Amino acid sequence: MLLHVIARGKIGRSPEAELVDRYARRISWGWKVTELPDRGGTVPPPSHTPSRTVAMDERGRQLTSSEFAAILGRWRDDGVRETRFLIGAADGHDEALRESADLLIAFGNATWPHMLARAMLAEQLWRATSILAGHPYHREG
């Protein structure tokens, strides 16, 4: 399954970009990043179908890493070919996008800079795929 991160803002050469790259290199599933301007631009349609859309949103569900892995694993096993992860800019996502998403996820109650959220998402995607592969990286409790 392709993991497609669609993020507002250019990450450029930054410590956050280094973190994203570090975890992206470890992910054995397909990986793609599309950057959009902070304002304007349109979210591209899925490259593959069937697909799922996950919006990173402060009002979303707070999942454990194992719960997140289970969702991705179920989608993969159900034949989903692409999961798109949308990271908004400073103002987040509009209501229409939130309503159209298959899942809303939050990284806790705090508000995170969108560049840091991208690095956190990359780590969680690595962790989820490693859990599904039975890799010892993740430890519960």
Swiss-Prot record:
List, alphabetically, the CDD domains matched. RlmH-like (cd18081)
What family is reported? Belongs to the RNA methyltransferase RlmH family.
Coiled-coil positions: none
Q: What is this protein called?
A: Ribosomal RNA large subunit methyltransferase H
Write down the InterPro entries for this protein, in alphabetical order: Alpha/beta_knot_MTases (IPR029028), RlmH-like (IPR003742), tRNA_m1G_MTases_N (IPR029026)
HAMAP family tied to this protein: 23SrRNA_methyltr_H
Assembly: Homodimer.
**What Pfam families does this protein map onto?**
SPOUT_MTase
- According to its UniProt record, where is this protein mainly located? cytoplasm
Which top EC class is given? transferase
